[in-house]
Swiss-Prot record:
Keywords for this protein: Lipid transport, Secreted, Signal, Transport, VLDL
Lineage, highest ranks first: Eukaryota, Metazoa, Chordata, Craniata, Vertebrata
Similarity remark: Belongs to the apolipoprotein C1 family.
Provenance organism: Eidolon helvum
Protein name per the record: Apolipoprotein C-I
One MF term in the entry's GO annotations: phospholipase inhibitor activity
Function: Inhibitor of lipoprotein binding to the low density lipoprotein (LDL) receptor, LDL receptor-related protein, and very low density lipoprotein (VLDL) receptor. Associates with high density lipoproteins (HDL) and the triacylglycerol-rich lipoproteins in the plasma and makes up about 10% of the protein of the VLDL and 2% of that of HDL. Appears to interfere directly with fatty acid uptake and is also the major plasma inhibitor of cholesteryl ester transfer protein (CETP). Binds free fatty acids and reduces their intracellular esterification.
Gene from which this protein is expressed: APOC1
GO cellular component: high-density lipoprotein particle; very-low-density lipoprotein particle
InterPro entries according to UniProt: ApoC-1_sf, ApoC-I
Length: 88
């Protein structure tokens, strides 16, 4: 999962670095630029992590898995009854 998230982040960072500074920006040294990028990446990573954890918690608290299980059980029971009546 980390690899899936890190590849798009790496692509965005490379695009930002290769794009270069905007004309209105003053020239900065590489170390401050890399620190800025790392800070933004950490902020982005923590934001994504919070959102994913929140989504997982909501799924765990919801009764969707139970409803899905019940639905499949009901459908299976109906199919089973249909086979019994058809082939008996």
């Amino acid at each position: 999962m980390r690899l899936i998230l890190s590849l798009p982040v790496l692509a965005v960072v490379l695009a930002m670095v290769l794009e270069g500074p905007a004309p209105a920006q003053a020239t900065t040294d590489v170390s401050s630029t890399s620190e800025s990028i790392l800070g933004k990446l950490k902020e982005f990573g923590s934001t994504v992590e919070e959102k994913v954890r929140t989504a997982i918690d909501q799924i765990k608290k919801s009764n969707v898995p139970e409803k899905t299980k019940n639905w499949f059980s009901e459908v299976f029971q109906k199919v089973k009854e249909k086979f019994e009546t058809t082939f008996s």
